[in-house]
Amino acid sequence: MRVLLSNDDGVHAAGLKALAEAFHGDEVWVVAPDREQSASSHAISLHRPLRLLEVAPRWYAVDGTPTDAVYMGLNLVLRDARPDVVVSGVNHGPNLGNDVLYSGTVAAAMEGALLGVNAIAVSLAAPPPHDFGEAARFAAALARQVVARPPPAPVLLNVNVPPGPVRGYRFARLGRRTYGNEVVEKTDPRGRKYYWIGGEGRVHNEDIPGSDCNTVLLERLAAVTPLHLDGTHDPMFQELRSWTVPGYEKEPAP
C-alpha cells in the first residue's frame, strides 16, 4: 500500500512520526508543512512561490500550508505513482464538530479527496503530553479497510481518538462546539495595541447523542465521521425555489 502522509503541525511533529511508524511495512511518503500551521483551514498559496525540501528519504517539507503540501505531494512528488490513501495527522488535539471548518489537518485530507484520493484526517483528543501511538495505529487499520473496500467516489473520513487504548469506535455525526468569542486587547512595549482572538479554556460541546463530541469526550470511543465535499444545503435550496428577488427575473430564457 502506498500512503501519502501530511499534517498541520509541521514536518517534524511527533504525531506525524507516529503515523509513519504505524504504516511500517507500507510504502510511506511524507509531504508536510515545514512549520506549525494549525487552524490554517483550506488556505492555498497562489501568490508566492513554494519551496520543497527533502529532509529524509521520501520525507519532504513545504514552506506552505497543509493544502499546499498535499497538492505538491499528489501533483509533483507522487505525480506518476498515485497513493492508495492520504492520511493527515496525528493532530495534537481534537478536531470535533465545527472544528473541521478551521482545521488544517482536515483540510489536508480534504485536498486529497478533492484530487481524487481516499483520505483520512486523524486527531488525538487529549491534552499534552501526547501518546500518539494508539491513534496512529487506529488510523492505519482504518486506512487498510478503505483501500480494501474502496467507495465509488473518494471518501473523506474525520477521525478523533480519545486518550489511552481504543476500546471501540462509532461512526458518528459532527457535533457542535463553541469557543469563547472574545477579543483580548494588549499593549506592546511601544504602546501599540494588539489583539488575541478565540479565547482560551471556554469550549462548550452541545450534548447531541451520537455526535463525535459525545462519542469521544463522554463515551471515550473513537469517532469516525464521513465528511461531504458538496457544501450545498439541500433543504434551504428547496426553500429558495419559492423565493423571488424584487426587480429581477428568475431563470430568464437565454
Swiss-Prot record:
Keyword set includes Repressor: no
TM segment ranges: none
Entry-linked PANTHER family: 5'-NUCLEOTIDASE SURE, 5'_3'-NUCLEOTIDASE SURE
EC class: hydrolase
Cofactor: a divalent metal cation
Reaction(s) the record says it catalyses: a ribonucleoside 5'-phosphate + H2O = a ribonucleoside + phosphate
Binding site for a divalent metal cation: D8, D9, S38, N91
MF (Gene Ontology): 3'-nucleotidase activity; 5'-nucleotidase activity; exopolyphosphatase activity; metal ion binding; nucleotide binding
Protein name per UniProt: 5'-nucleotidase SurE
Native source species: Anaeromyxobacter dehalogenans (strain 2CP-1 / ATCC BAA-258)
Gene3D superfamilies given in the database record: Survival protein SurE-like phosphatase/nucleotidase
InterPro entries reported in the protein's UniProt record: SurE, SurE-like_Pase/nucleotidase, SurE-like_sf
EC number in record: 3.1.3.5
Localization (cell): Cytoplasm
Record function comment: Nucleotidase that shows phosphatase activity on nucleoside 5'-monophosphates.
Membership in a protein family: Belongs to the SurE nucleotidase family.
GO cellular component: cytoplasm
Co-factor remark: Binds 1 divalent metal cation per subunit.
UniProt keyword list: Cytoplasm, Hydrolase, Metal-binding, Nucleotide-binding
